[in-house]
UniProtKB/Swiss-Prot annotation:
Any one Gene Ontology molecular-function term assigned to this protein's record: structural constituent of ribosome
Gene: rpsN
Subunit details: Part of the 30S ribosomal subunit. Contacts proteins S3 and S10.
GO cellular component: cytoplasm; small ribosomal subunit
Gene Ontology annotations of biological process type: translation
Protein name per the record: Small ribosomal subunit protein uS14A
Function: Binds 16S rRNA, required for the assembly of 30S particles and may also be responsible for determining the conformation of the 16S rRNA at the A site.
Amino acid sequence: MAKKSKIAKEQKREKLVAQYYELRKELKDKGDYEALRKLPRDSSPTRLTRRCKVTGRPRGVYRKFGMSRIALRDYAHKGQIPGVKKSSW
């Protein structure tokens, strides 16, 4: 489990990215890089990190499920993810 402060920080970044999305897009289209530079750093989508929705783990996260490989395996074995089952061949 990730630290709660790290998870909260990432959520704060997500809010900032959503808040400044339109403004950033307009400034980029105009080519006003000076104004872009004055915006908060955390409003840039590049600074976002995908984190597991269950554990907050930053590494090994599947985009399709939004979960880390470890949490995905646990949930899949319990049958809590529809359409996912253990394969064998």
